[in-house]
Amino acid sequence: MNRQFLAALTILTVSAAAHAQMTPVGTWHTIDDKTNEVKSEIVITESGGVVSGKVAKLLRKGAKQDATCEKCSDDRKGKPILGMEILRDLKKVDGKDVWEGGKVLDPEDGSTYTARLTPIEGGKKLEMRGSFAFISRTQTWVRVP
């Protein structure tokens, strides 16, 4: 009986850990689409059911750590990219491991897109899809262990 209990407890623990990772909350490396180089580290948090993300580190070789978003057109214009909130107002879709309804900012060109986050590969990676009208682009971010 003790073996059955331990086996059931192990299965529940592993299942809970796997489910806990199917969330965008955590620390992620963004990857350059063209060079496959790690660009930055983004920390995604959740508060009151709303997900947001900030630039925690600029990791690209030669990145100016004091760079500001001069091309931004909202409240982030002229502000430091390091520490900047680039993901705003995403909410979980009922019954799915998908977060949407918010925006993502590309601080390199100041463009803002409708955002959709989907954890994949057991939560080890995150598909970040940015859309504007009929144009969309998906990046795959990698969870930092």
Pin down the residues of each PLM region:
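Edge beta-strand at a domain terminus
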Residues: 123, 131-145
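Cleavable N-terminal signal peptides
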Residues: 7-8, 18
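Central antiparallel beta-sheet cores of small beta-barrel/beta-sandwich binding domains
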Residues: 31-115
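Structural motif
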Residues: 47, 120-122
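Bacterial N-terminal signal peptides that target proteins for export
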Residues: 1-7
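N-terminal helix-cap/turn-to-beta initiation motif at the start of protein domains
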Residues: 18-27
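Beta-strand residues in well-ordered beta-sheet regions across diverse protein folds
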Residues: 54, 127-129
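N-terminal signal peptide c-region/cleavage motif recognized by signal peptidases
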Residues: 13-17
